[in-house]
């Protein structure tokens, strides 16, 4: 009987010794583990503390961001004042389009924007009309309708302000530790193409239709758009003093563009835009530093042409991809909710965007569970690595979809890659940090979860070049860059060659080094 008691005594002593070491082991966290713990402490301290923590977290990029909707109303009004644009005080929009008129040229029914500082009430009304600020849903004025109406209110300013607008968005991104933007934009020249579009005979095939457009000079229009973007970007970088001894923080943000096609139009106008967008992006991607890196279709998905011609639009893209096989496509699909359209309209948009149009990414994807065979679709998206651009605030204010009604948890459960994005941060009066906080508070996303979203935003970006990673779980880097990955050391040799050849890999290494600095700083705070 003595042997068991002796063993028990030895086990007790061993347990005491182990317990003495547990606190020290618990404190021996990796920088990532400590950062995750710090985020949980911030979460427990409340929304403001969580926001402060997330503001400094590296976020990679914003992949779903409309340039016109990203600019805050105050900027548009300041530019309108500079140009002495006339404002209709009843309709709350710009009435003088194009070239800036002389001071005092507004008629008695309109107001010169330069006088707005003396008209605070009108100024406030304009900000509210240009955005979701102070919006309260009412009969005849839903969040959906108010949101999309904002674009008609602030449309019409001179395109010469575009470098300033991009600078504003890039500066805001830099302040939140973002490093990459894919901004959706419709060039002014596209509106001329739309106006000149003519009907074609019903028997004309897509290839012949495309050739007719090219023969009519659409290729020259594409060149003009690319040259204009070159000028805009040069002006922006000069304004930000990029490449000088005192660059603005916005210079640290890599900016690329998605050609934005307006889809709520007759088929000939949509087709001509898609061809033009493909022409622009294909030529740009073949250059040494492309600005346009992909294509998207925009405007409300529930609008008349958007719904009636949805399958037709997917077929147009599919037919044209044979001519432009290297141009990536992301599509707004599933930005719908029950009641907004008939039930039949919820059953196929996401699937057709992927299976017909060949979209590599999906914007919104809110109605995925109303699609035919939704679980099959989720599994297919995971297998194909189709990323969903998640816009939480936008889905809330436009569709009324939030919390348990949002498919974000389902996408994550089925391993469909996601990346948080803003959609129209100026209209919604938010930023990407707000979306990270919303995801953390609403869906209990942890630091590793948010870190994966940030990594996804670069991995699934349309930046050209080879990925830094050999897997989609971010565990196996390219061997040549393994040493540089988790340090602040400058890449050399074969790794440096990879980064030079691949803008994507360069941005991925930059993100990892930002995580390294952020997490080590978080760990240092505990000592």
Regions found by a protein language model. Give the residues of each.
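N-terminal metal-binding scaffold of metallo-dependent hydrolase/deaminase domains
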Residues: 8-9, 26-28
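Bacterial N-terminal signal peptides
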Residues: 10-20
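Metal-cofactor-binding active-site regions of metalloenzymes
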Residues: 27-527
């Amino acid at each position: 009987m003595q042997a068991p008691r002796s063993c028990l005594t030895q086990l007790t002593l061993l347990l005491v010794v182990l317990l003495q070491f547990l606190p020290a082991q618990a404190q021996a966290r990796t920088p990532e583990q400590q950062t995750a713990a710090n985020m949980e402490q911030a979460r427990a301290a409340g929304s403001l503390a969580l926001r402060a923590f997330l503001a400094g977290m590296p976020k990679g990029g914003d992949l779903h961001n409309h340039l016109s909707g990203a600019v805050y109303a105050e900027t548009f009004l300041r530019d309108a004042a500079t140009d002495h644009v006339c404002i209709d005080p009843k309709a709350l929009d710009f009435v003088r389009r194009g070239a800036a008129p002389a001071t005092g040229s507004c008629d008695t029914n309109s107001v010169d924007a330069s006088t707005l500082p003396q008209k605070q009430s009108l100024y406030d009304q304009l900000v509210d009309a240009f955005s979701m600020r102070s919006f309260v849903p009412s009969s005849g004025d839903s969040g959906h309708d108010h949101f999309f109406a904002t674009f008609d209110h602030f449309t019409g300013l001179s395109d010469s302000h575009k470098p300033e607008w991009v600078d504003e968005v890039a500066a805001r991104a830099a302040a939140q530790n973002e490093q990459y933007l894919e901004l959706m934009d419709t060039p002014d020249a596209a509106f001329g193409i739309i106006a000149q579009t003519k009907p074609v005979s019903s028997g004309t095939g897509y290839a012949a239709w495309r050739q007719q457009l090219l023969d009519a000079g659409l290729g020259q229009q594409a060149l003009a758009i690319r040259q204009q973007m070159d000028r805009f970007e040069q002006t922006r970088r000069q304004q930000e003093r990029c490449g000088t001894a005192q660059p603005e923080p916005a210079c640290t943000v890599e900016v690329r563009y998605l050609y934005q096609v307006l889809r709520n139009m007759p088929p000939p106008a949509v087709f001509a835009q898609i061809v033009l967008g493909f022409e622009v992006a294909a030529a740009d991607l073949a250059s040494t530093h492309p600005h346009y890196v992909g294509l998207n279709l925009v405007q409300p998905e529930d609008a008349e042409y958007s719904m009636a011609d949805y399958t037709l639009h997917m077929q147009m893209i599919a037919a044209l991809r044979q001519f432009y096989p290297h141009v990536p496509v992301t599509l707004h699909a599933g930005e719908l909710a029950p009641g907004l359209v008939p039930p039949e309209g919820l059953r196929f948009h996401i699937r057709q965007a992927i299976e017909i149009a060949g979209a590599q990414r999906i914007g919104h994807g809110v109605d995925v569970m109303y699609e035919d065979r939704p679980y099959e679709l989720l599994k297919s998206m995971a297998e194909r690595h189709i990323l969903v651009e998640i816009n939480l605030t936008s889905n809330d204010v436009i569709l009324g979809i939030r919390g348990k009604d949002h498919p974000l948890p389902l996408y994550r459960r089925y391993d469909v890659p996601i990346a948080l994005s803003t959609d129209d941060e100026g209209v919604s009066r938010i930023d990407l940090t707000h979306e990270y906080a919303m995801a953390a508070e609403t869906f209990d996303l942890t630091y590793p979860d948010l870190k994966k979203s940030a990594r996804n935003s670069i991995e699934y970006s349309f930046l050209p070049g080879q990925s830094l990673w050999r897997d989609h779980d971010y565990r196996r880097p390219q061997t040549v860059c393994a040493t540089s990955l988790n340090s602040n050391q400058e890449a050399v040799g074969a790794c440096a060659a990879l980064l030079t050849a691949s803008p994507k890999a360069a941005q991925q290494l930059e993100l990892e080094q930002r995580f390294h600095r952020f997490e080590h700083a978080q760990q240092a705070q505990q000592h």
